[in-house]
UniProtKB/Swiss-Prot annotation:
Protein S19 forms a complex with S13 that binds strongly to the 16S ribosomal RNA. Belongs to the universal ribosomal protein uS19 family. GO terms for molecular function: rRNA binding; structural constituent of ribosome. The lineage of its organism: Eukaryota, Viridiplantae, Streptophyta, Embryophyta, Tracheophyta. This is Small ribosomal subunit protein uS19c. It comes from Cuscuta reflexa (Southern Asian dodder). The keyword rRNA-binding applies. Its main location: plastid. PROSITE patterns: RIBOSOMAL_S19. The keyword Ribonucleoprotein applies.
Length: 92
């Protein structure tokens, strides 16, 4: 179910503070966050945000076509290794 248009998009407060500080400094720095549910807003464009995958932080460069999506959409938590191979010797 989509979020109501009456409400503002969810962005974690600590993440928003870090982005505002970097916009004032005009420095490029990787921002580390655990907030996968935060929505990407236009002031995040151009920053590199390291999103937690459950094991490590994956750095993602935010571009303008990502605005409106959630941070967690770009950092996968599962690693698909392929289906099990068919082993006819073990079957009877």
């Amino acid at each position: 179910m989509a979020r109501s248009l009456k409400k503002n998009p969810f962005v974690a407060k600590n993440l928003l503070k870090k982005i505002y500080k970097l916009n004032i400094k005009t420095e490029k720095e990787i921002i580390i966050t655990w907030s996968r549910g935060s929505t990407i807003i236009p002031i995040m464009v151009g920053h590199t945000i390291a999103i937690h995958t459950g094991k490590e932080h994956l750095p993602i460069y935010i571009m303008d076509h990502m605005v409106g999506h959630k941070l967690g959409e770009f950092a996968f938590t599962l690693n698909f290794r392929g289906h099990a191979k068919t082993d006819n010797r073990s079957r009877r």
